[in-house]
From Swiss-Prot:
Result after altering residue 623 to E: In strain: Large white and Norwegian Landrace
Known EC number: 3.1.1.79, 3.1.1.23
Pfam families from the UniProt entry: Abhydrolase_3, HSL_N
InterPro entries: AB_hydrolase_3 (IPR013094), AB_hydrolase_fold (IPR029058), HSL_N (IPR010468), Lipase_GDXG_HIS_AS (IPR002168), Lipase_GDXG_put_SER_AS (IPR033140)
Keywords for the protein's UniProt record, in alphabetical order: Cell membrane, Cholesterol metabolism, Cytoplasm, Hydrolase, Lipid degradation, Lipid droplet, Lipid metabolism, Membrane, Phosphoprotein, Steroid metabolism, Sterol metabolism
Record organism: Sus scrofa
Record PTM text: Phosphorylation by AMPK reduces its translocation towards the lipid droplets.
Protein's UniProt name: Hormone-sensitive lipase
Mutagenesis or variant effect for residue 160 to R: In strain: Large white
First-tier enzyme category under EC: hydrolase
Annotated phenotype, changing residue 644 to S: In strain: Large white
Purpose of the protein: Lipase with broad substrate specificity, catalyzing the hydrolysis of triacylglycerols (TAGs), diacylglycerols (DAGs), monoacylglycerols (MAGs), cholesteryl esters and retinyl esters. Shows a preferential hydrolysis of DAGs over TAGs and MAGs. Preferentially hydrolyzes fatty acid (FA) esters at the sn-3 position of the glycerol backbone in DAGs and FA esters at the sn-1 and sn-2 positions of the glycerol backbone in TAGs.
Protein family (similarity comment): Belongs to the 'GDXG' lipolytic enzyme family.
Example of a GO cellular component annotation carried by this entry: cytoplasm
Amino acid sequence: MDLRTMTQSLVTLAEDNMAFFSGQGPGETARRLSGVFAGIREQALGLEPALGRLLSVAHLFDLDAETPANGYRSLVHTARCCLAHLLHKSRYVASNRRSIFFRTSHNLAELEAYLAALTQLRALAYYAQRLLAINRPGKLFFEGDEGITADFLREYVTLHKGCFYGRCLGFQFTPAIRPFLQTISIGLVSFGEHYKRNETGLSVTASSLFTSGRFAIDPELRGAEFERIIQNLDVHFWKAFWNITEIEVLSSLANMASATVRVSRLLSLPPKAFEMPLTADPKLTVTISPPLAHTGPGPVLVRLISYDLREGQDSEELSSLVRSEGPRGLELRPRPQQAPRSRSLVVHIHGGGFVAQTSKSHEPYLKSWAQELGVPILSIDYSLAPEAPFPRALEECFYAYCWAVKHCGLLGSTGERICLAGDSAGGNLCFTVSLRAAAYGVRVPDGIMAAYPATMLQSAASPSRLLSLMDPLLPLSVLSKCVSAYAGGEMEDHSDSDQKALGMMGLVRRDTALLFRDLRLGASSWLNSFLELSGHKSRPNLVPTEEPMRRSVSEAALAQPEGPLGTDSLKYLTLHDLSLSSETQDTPELSLSAETLGPTTPSAVNFLFRPEDAPEEAEARDDISTKEEKVYSVRAAFPEGFHPRRSSQGAIQMPLYSAPIVKNPFMSPLLAPDSMLQTLPPVHIVACALDPMLDDSVMFARRLRSLGQPVTLHVVEDLPHGFLSLAALCRETRQAAALCVDRIRFILNPPGPATPAGPTTPPV
């Protein structure tokens, strides 16, 4: 169904339902249902022309006709998903509204939530239109200095997001993955309650499990709490949450479902300099020094994974590098025969926003790769930010890559073909490691497979970045905090000093007491929530006669006396309300002042701001508050009468970031000069159509193709960022993971005669 037909069908159904409920008397329920359908009609009619304009020019930003993908297309697709859900729900209401089994309360809550989502999507469509108007032809990232990114920041950070994390969570993704996203969101908000209590990882996880009942029952509460967490908690919270998968119990469970391999060893590479032959003249060598940045020389951890035991992998030299990971069970299987060295090697760099995870959490899909490809895989455990900011991770990955090239024989490979593979932040490091190898003059890999890579860490507005408003895995503020930590803007958290002082037995005693306390409170909370919900469902009147202690987000908005949709609700401060702050003293003023956005430290790189827009932070704030309001007034963002919903959490702490380090080509490879990009080997990118970082992949591929570099771009539909870690979840993620394996296989076994990219080192 095309966009116009879908919109017309939805409008017709909305008008029919609106007329029906308007004639049901003066009851509150009928009034709210009539009002919500009136809102659906209004937003759908306003959204359709904006989406049509975006779709009419979206093809100009594709890599080619065979790869129709960019942020504009993704926004249109997301809005279509929301319209399709509302169309389905409106048809259901029209068919069942007279039935005695019609669940009025449930359907009303769902319609309200999706109306809020549709309103916010309309705002994003207008933002995308403005980007389209001011961007250079064919450019997805804003590169001008007109101050439009300041205007984006001022408006975007205050948009209401909770509706996307409650009932509408993951509506844009494939249905098979939505239960997983709901589990993640419930775990996140529950984990947030126990964060900073000085509990150990297992205790926090267990406590969160038993106190999450009310978040599972109440989607509106979950959405509001999710919004609070993403806007207020620092990078250390996200580091702790993402590292839950590193807990021994959980990692063991994950490994039980993964492929069984003969070799999975954690190695510690000593910080010793060594020589590498130059590609131009193998008789000459260059010294590869150990990592030095920030913390001085130190070992680099890597994990060797091989489906078969190959020659060299059980050598004494390699065994001397093995690092113990705890007690191992008795090996009862007979010692296998050694397979010959593989002609290929995969060097893998994991993702995690530069701040979290290790090869251990990525081991399940790496084992599958080792089995399917039949080659050894070396995964690098680089040091993480904020404790080890840029360029420490790059130095460690480059050192480990060079060590692997030189000592490939120990890893069970002859090194004829070498592939660099990584996802997200790991994809970024794959590109920069290859650029550094070319700069040193040593062998570059034969190809790079990057899954949903981050190639643009400099702050700049783009249409796909707008998707971060609704993405449960990559919200805008989380992206900002991760990049800030990697750039050195986040200081190390020393809040664990008390844990060290307690000692192991003290931690165990304290965590046991806290766990039993949380079990008791969690059971009570869950029972109260269940009884409250049951009591609510048993009432004949859906709206209680007394004001409850806490209303849902949608109820609070619709219960206001002004207008059918409660447009004056303080839960959703509109742009109009904020612009009248001089007349209403209790409404906060929306500006980029230090009072609004926090201290002017480089602690929050935002993805909607370029450093050029703020060469001097004090001048930039003054300039934005005066000149930018004249040129890009807040009211000019939207048509007359349209006001998106605003967050009750206040502005995200995202001050302007002016450090030039984010423009470093070894940090943002998209900004590298042509001469550097021309040194890259063939690049194969697998991106997600609904990923806030989609434009990174599209623009990087366009840039390489314009230079005549071999590059392919494959875009998978309806999956979130990070699908490799979800490979076993459903058919769609398995197919996407198989595409990554296919790209690696193409690099290792190219059609026609294969020639190494550089001189190979004799196996050690």
